[in-house]
Amino acid sequence: MSSTKWTDEQRQAVFTKNCNLLVAAGAGAGKTAVLVQRIIEKILDKEEPIDIDKLLVVTFTNAAAAEMRERIGDAISKGLDENPESKALRKQLTLLNKSNIMTIHSFCLQIIKNNFHTIEIDPNFRICDETEGILMKQEAMDELFDELYEIENKDFINLVESYASRKDTRLQEVVLELHRFAKSAPFPYDWLLNMAEEFNVGEEFNFEETLWADMIMEDMKVLLHGFKNMLQQSIDVILNSEGIDYYYEPFKMDLNFINSLLEKSSFKEFRGEIIAYDFPKLPLKRNKDADKEAKERVKKLRDRVKKKILEIKNILNSYENEFIKKEFIFLYPSMKALSNLVILFDKKYEAKKRERDLIDFNDIEHLCLSILTDKDSEDHIIPSDTALDYRKKFTEVLIDEYQDSNLVQEVIMSMVSRVKGYWSFYNGQLMFNEEEINLEEPHIGLDIPNRFMVGDVKQSIYRFRQAKPEIFLDKYNEYSEEESIKNRKVKLFKNFRSREEVINGVNYLFKQIMSKTIGELDYTEEEALKVGASYGEEVKGEPIELCLMDKKYEISEEVLKEYNMDEEEALDNIQLEGRLVAKKIQKLVGNNLEGGLKVFDKKLGEYRNLQYRDIVILMRATSNWAPVFVEELAKEGIPVFADTNSGYFNTTEIKTIISLLQIIDNPLQDIPLLSVLRSPIASFTDDELIDIRMVNKNIAFYECMEIIYKLYKDEELDSYYSFYMEDEDKTNKIVKDIKEELKNKICSFIEKLNLWRKKSIHIDIDEFIWFLYVETGYYGYVGALPAGEQRQANLRILFQRAKQYEKTSYKGLFNFINFINKLKFSSGDMGSAKILGENENVVRIMSIHKSKGLEFPVVILSGTGKNFNMMDLNKNILFHRDLGYGPDYVDTERRIAYPSLVKNIIKNKIRLETLSEEMRILYVALTRAREKLIITGLINNMDKTVEDWLNLSDDKNKVPEYAVMSGKTYLDWIGPALIKHKDAVSLREELKITSGLSNIVDDKSKWKIELWNKKELLKEKVEENEVEISEKIKETLMNLGESNYKEEIYKKLSFKYKYDNASSIPTKLSVSDVKKQFILDEKENTEELFKKVELRKPMFMGEEKKISPSERGTIIHLFMQHLDLKKAENEEDIKEQINRLIEREFITYEQSKIINPYKILKFCRSELGKRMINSNNINREMPFSIEVPAVEIYRELDKDIYKDEKLIIQGIIDCYFEEEEGLVLLDYKTDYVNDIEEIKNRYEIQIKYYEEALNRITGKNVKDKYLYLFSVDNYIKID
């Protein structure tokens, strides 16, 4: 076994044989390492080695599969180093390329390609693009609806009238959603028909004996447990308070009633007892010694219970069997019609795919399933001959991320694994039956179980993709930890990622809030994470921080006046939370001198200062919040990048180009036309557009332009225009009065547009788009704007989308525009192009889903006060994979519509499942942190909210399930759990809350709870605007008449600061600014610093764009930042790395020509390059800020007056690396060199500040400083 020190549980997971093994691995437990080690041990086993191609390893992503292959390859290579003569190891290395380590979809695709003849598909099939599939679906849908309207299909018409509202699109959306949903079932047609048949009830129907009735009762029992806690709490207060003991009996009767209900197993008895119960009246006794506060408190609690029980009673009263039966009978025809409509749609869509030899992503699993399954005489689903061959082939089947499996994948894996049993339908549900099946040929080794499944159900967060965590949970509850049994489980809950402080906090929180009801698992001490990581004693861990801000914090008029703000500006909540986070980050990072957080660097094996790249801000959804946070962090000088899936189609450059394509396809579209006309592509002014529109207000804008064009060119107008012109003479006069310049502009635009329209017909769309970029100069134009690199990358993405489109079965500009429109909605927007590498020193903002599997030294979870998304519950038909359809009851004749009983049941079930998913998402978020965890959130009303939290905190061990069920935000869960923690005492004191102090939980977790208010954060916003406001006042005064006070006010506003010289000095300078200042100081003659600017046409608008020296330097620096020194042995290696940067869109092909592979290779082979390669600690592109005396930079300042003035110098160090005696500083230069001494003098001061920054930041000595000069392929040492 490897040199890694494995725990006993990990060893069991690696070595256990001859059983189905489920490994439940908590966050940070090293499950991937265990899975890889198990594979390595099997192929390197000295007694019974298994060839690696006899193992099937199913991963969740292609990246995971590649990483696994690499690790296994490294292990085999290491074995060969120790035993070079080993034929067995060489064989495994050769077989590694043929190994079956892949995603489930890759495995299914492999099966389809090897067995295409059994399912009658063309062997040259292609997987269609997602958007191409959407276009085909829309075609199929439109054709199907037209056909059904034409034959006047009665059931279809009724369905349309009931659920389509005024547009067919609403019903079409229902069909598409149900189609997607059904495809998550192994046998979609069976599922659709079975779910419709659930409404086909006979006279013998008895609702009280159905699954739905049991579900209603179980859901209500969760609430009853909450009522029981309230009543028990009240009784405790009664018994411990003065003078209210006469309340004991009625409260005890209520409690007995609740206990009786909780014991009921029959819905009929349960319903009957609730309906029959009347709450006894409370005695009307007066006792002057009675504790009035306690009396009022218990009365309020009982009133809450009574109100809720009355609501339940009213619901149950409506559950009359006959009424429910009539509802089912009425809905059956519609639901059957809906199932049939989806099946007809699927068949039409399938036909379209077959015409084009296409399959879509969903087909991959279903076609594979059809190859691997067969049916016996009893209609049981059993393995086919092909599946049996795979069972013989694979000695073991290993499944990673098992908690995210869906039912289709589970059936597929069961077919190729050596399991005894079959699948069959029971009450409409597909179930696995673990029994012996009769096969024509006995399967050798079938009695030896061979499945290895690893995952963490607490991290199952893909229910929206139809993942079914119940598959994992069923086995987790069924399998045993005992040895020598066929179905065994091993628990890996030791966390090797996080500090003890993070783990203790996570454990405390989820013990309080996660349960089988919400989370689908009881988070007990047994499930809790155990500390496995060691961070030493050098730096102590910090408590988890919870930062709360009151949304409804009242800001007085005086405060608003003081800050010169209006109320709307003052109450931008997302902005304020972003500002709060910015303050936290500034404090964490410090000023790179002291005060910042220290984090442990695994690569260095020591502590270092926190950098921006160590911080991630996690959000449930980033679309609306991330842009605001980016803006707030950027204002504070914090480098930040938001990894979002939205915003791409809303960027100016993309909207402009899409508008241009739309008018090339059809210019009679006013909105896109005006968008293009106002853009730099056409550069029309608003006044010019008004002049054009005045020609005629009743026709399209382009037609107005055509009238001007034709009249100006003396061309005859079409009769169409004459018809719309109320007064032809008046129109002629309007056109005549239009300026000559505008007429020429219109003519030029129309002629260009006509040329573009003709060209679009004859070339591919991707070529045409690039032609437009160049022809209009727009690509160059956006590159010159702020964030130009990002804008150009976005345009390149559109070009790539066009290339992708050209590979589909659709052609032409019109279809491409449809393609893009569908892409907007199907992919939920794409997010802007990614231009940052993994090592960029920026704070990252990402969704919790994207963070899964990752870890970060510091995690900030924001937006915890944001409501969960429950919008799907408002649809007129709901779908559930087990419960089927939940439609509204719609009677078009009587004009009645309301949620059906089954819809209410399904709605509640989906709500609970959604809450369970949110619970697991919260778990994923909090377990990403290695060293520091911060949670931020907004609260509606702090005092009331905290009081509500206290009312839910009587049970020290658990927040009541009914309270968790009613939660609408993460804070609704976190708050009640923390308010009873010992570290929340300060919060209670600050809010002057004295109740509930007897329920303090003395847990070992450490928390720091902070209250923020808007006033604190608003103050700084105002200071930024003060100068601007002052200038506005002065401008107003200039326009006023004479006033006694005008002169005095103006004098004060024009006040000259005593230290005016210092006030003009910036507080922050770049190192380049400092260098320029020193060069200026050293010049004896007084040159003009500011010369007259000559305006000329930008280079990018000319025929050929030349790359400037500064851009050349930027490109070289970018490449050196990303250069992998270990993979730069020859020019081909370097060219490959250049191509990788082009593929990742870091540079363009044109820019890549600047990089000379030979010169890069010369650097790598130089003595300096070799030293750098041999270093174990290389740092590149490191930003810094240091404080220096102002007089050091600005020598004209009086040293006595300005001795205490400080400046912040900022810069980015190209590279430094560590050797035994100290650090080596390296700066790349692309200047053309004539005089070495001149270069040294030019950059001496710059290197000096780099050295000082490194000394201060690292605390280490800089032993050598070098400039590497690419123009002469040599380096010089700076003394």
Swiss-Prot record:
Keywords: ATP-binding, DNA damage, DNA repair, DNA-binding, Exonuclease, Helicase, Hydrolase, Isomerase, Nuclease, Nucleotide-binding. One of its GO terms (cellular component) is cytosol. It catalyses: Couples ATP hydrolysis with the unwinding of duplex DNA by translocating in the 3'-5' direction; ATP + H2O = ADP + phosphate + H(+). It holds the Pfam family UvrD-helicase. Its cofactor is Mg(2+). Its EC number is 3.1.-.-, 5.6.2.4. ATP binds at A25, G26, A27, G28, A29, G30, K31, T32. Residues 526-853 form the UvrD-like helicase C-terminal domain. Residues 4-499 form the UvrD-like helicase ATP-binding domain. One of its GO terms (molecular function) is double-stranded DNA binding. The heterodimer acts as both an ATP-dependent DNA helicase and an ATP-dependent, dual-direction single-stranded exonuclease. Recognizes the chi site generating a DNA molecule suitable for the initiation of homologous recombination. The AddA nuclease domain is required for chi fragment generation; this subunit has the helicase and 3' -> 5' nuclease activities. Belongs to the helicase family. AddA subfamily. NCBIfam families: addA_Gpos (TIGR02785). HAMAP family: AddA. This is ATP-dependent helicase/nuclease subunit A. The gene is addA.
